[in-house]
Amino acid sequence: MQNSEGGADSPASVALRPSAAAPPVPASPQRVLVQAASSAPKGAQMQPVSLPRVQQVPQQVQPAQHVYPAQVQYVEGGDAVYTNGAIRTAYTYNPEPQMYAPSSAASYFEAPGGAQVTVAASSPPAVPSHSMVGITMDVGGSPIVSSTGAYLIHGGMDSTRHSLAHTSRSSPATLEMAIENLQKSEGITSHKSGLLNSHLQWLLDNYETAEGVSLPRSSLYNHYLRHCQEHKLDPVNAASFGKLIRSVFMGLRTRRLGTRGNSKYHYYGIRLKPDSPLNRLQEDTQYMAMRQQPMHQKPRYRPAQKTDSLGDSGSHSSLHSTPEQTMAAQSQHHQQYIDVSHVFPEFPAPDLGSVLLQDGVTLHDVKALQLVYRRHCEATVDVVMNLQFHYIEKLWLSFWNSKASSSDGPTSLPASDEDPEGAVLPKDKLISLCQCDPILRWMRSCDHILYQALVEILIPDVLRPVPSTLTQAIRNFAKSLEGWLTNAMSDFPQQVIQTKVGVVSAFAQTLRRYTSLNHLAQAARAVLQNTSQINQMLSDLNRVDFANVQEQASWVCQCEESVVQRLEQDFKLTLQQQSSLDQWASWLDSVVTQVLKQHAGSPSFPKAARQFLLKWSFYSSMVIRDLTLRSAASFGSFHLIRLLYDEYMFYLVEHRVAEATGETPIAVMGEFNDLASLSLTLLDKDDMGDERRGSEAGPDAHSLGEPLVKRERSDPNHSLQGI
């Protein structure tokens, strides 16, 4: 490009011109492109190429700033035309996002000056407006068509072939450097560099970068081990494999996802390609076998191998795929969004105490129940990890309606751990065991652990983008749970059914809440990334009379005014900074920590947490009310954000209460699930505590009919009451 500094030796530049979508070009009437002025010999025949319309602009030379290679420069101004000393190719550019078919992707090559370059894509006769097609031009001194807002893409430094399609893969030099580093750090000999190249190629063929998704680190390494085993390759260790991945996918980040105490490392920004063979596996038994689990655990339930022939049909009749195979392939694709490396916790032992067992029930029967129920729960975990939700109904029917009877003798009970999966418990014996209160309480606690593990497997991160097909499958699964269990336990006593259904109902409600929260998060993410919407929200929020909101809400909430003002300022500041959804989540988490800090370790922590949720929701409603009365332009955005933040606050408080009480979130939410069994003693205790605090406040506390927040302004000695 000629300019004031570089002259004719400056690097090559190619202009991408934004253009409206052009109609397809007919196959027969060819359209001749720009006849570019060149330094080629006279009489040389130029080859016409059919293209969408390209506007010819008179040649002009305008001084430009020095442009460096391998960069993208945005050029402001009018119809400026730049002269290029070594032009490669000019391409039409469509600002709308497009998916380029492989047949329309073209490549361009470096060539010496003065040579004629013709680059044409192997596209069909009707060329869409977004296709990348080549231009027949002389290389020497041809004008580049330019316009307002043109993007200049500059040529590379070397003389190697370049692909026009942008990818996040590393260059060959980077891959060679990664191999050299591995050879030095791991002592790998040079003759094994070919093996490393095959590993790198496997990574590039099966994985791609994608924003907003993550993949368990153990899952990716297990896929790699499977590949090495199938192709009889020597795998590198996990640490070296991690270095290899980071050299291929630049900027890859690592996150620790999951609940506190049971989180796993994930690679953030990478996923399986949709066309990867790993997505078409019907039953990844080796992958499941390599999950992190204690060595003493036996092989678990394999539904696709034991109940039907999905696994066999996938390997022998891949040319004729059935709907079941398509569903299995989709499940394999969805497994990257769940936590398949989750370790199933151990169950506690039943506390029988001094309770006398019923007639016909022995301690051997109790131990048999422990073993059989553990295996049943492990089978449930494996079915859910495979996303084969319809097998849950079959599992429950087979467990709670065993064909064996106590008259078959002790052989029907597992006498050892050698064959646990073949062991069954007679139905009448199972009913007798469940009628024992300590056994029923033990089974309830086991269910809390089981269903909490299933929640963490299916939804490891409530804010992470998840395909709508997976979300809908989880919601349909939650909708069917209560009916399946009630049908399977129809012959059991009503008390046993109520206990079991109460826990599974809390599990189903949690799945519905978390999927709704995830849906809100994806909708709000688009709002938080829109600068104009954020500015409008900030403008509307500054018009809200927060002093009036505090006056009205103080009588109900009795919150400390300084805390409310601080939250208001923090909210506006976070909004002004155009924070991401993850940053908002961190701020909400800090609010919960700040408010509940004074109640840490106190028996009143659960009640204080519930009161905070009520007050947060009330204040949010008052702000939304003010925005509604003012006909705020950003009311819709605020309404969406408010729904998301309320749900996420519920999620945070739920987990804080579970951590404080030593229970699982499922157990916390199932505490008041059955309104018929709601004990008023807890409410009485809360009321008694309130009365006791009221009596300590003095006799005039009941006589004054105004809120504490208002009275504190006139009474400087009155202590501030926190949220």
From Swiss-Prot:
Compositional bias of kind Polar residues: 323-332
SUPFAM superfamilies given in the database record: Winged helix' DNA-binding domain (SSF46785)
Residue ranges with Low complexity bias: 10-20, 307-322
GO cellular component: cytoplasm; nucleus
Keyword line: Cilium biogenesis/degradation, Cytoplasm, Differentiation, DNA-binding, Nucleus, Phosphoprotein, Spermatogenesis, Transcription, Transcription regulation
Region (Disordered): 1-46, 292-332, 689-723
GO biological process, one term: regulation of transcription by RNA polymerase II
The entry's DNA-binding region: 199-274
Keyword field contains Iron: no
Modified residues (Phosphoserine): S28, S416
Subcellular location: Nucleus; Cytoplasm
Coiled-coil regions listed: none
One MF annotation (Gene Ontology) recorded for this entry: DNA-binding transcription factor activity
Pfam families attached to this UniProt entry: BCD_RFX (PF25340), RFX1_trans_act (PF04589), RFX_DNA_binding (PF02257)
Keyword Ribosomal protein in annotation: no
Self-association and partners: Homodimer; probably only forms homodimers in testis. Heterodimer; heterodimerizes with RFX1 and RFX3.
Task performed by this protein: Transcription factor that acts as a key regulator of spermatogenesis. Acts by regulating expression of genes required for the haploid phase during spermiogenesis, such as genes required for cilium assembly and function. Recognizes and binds the X-box, a regulatory motif with DNA sequence 5'-GTNRCC(0-3N)RGYAAC-3' present on promoters. Probably activates transcription of the testis-specific histone gene H1-6.
Similarity section: Belongs to the RFX family.
Record's protein name: DNA-binding protein RFX2
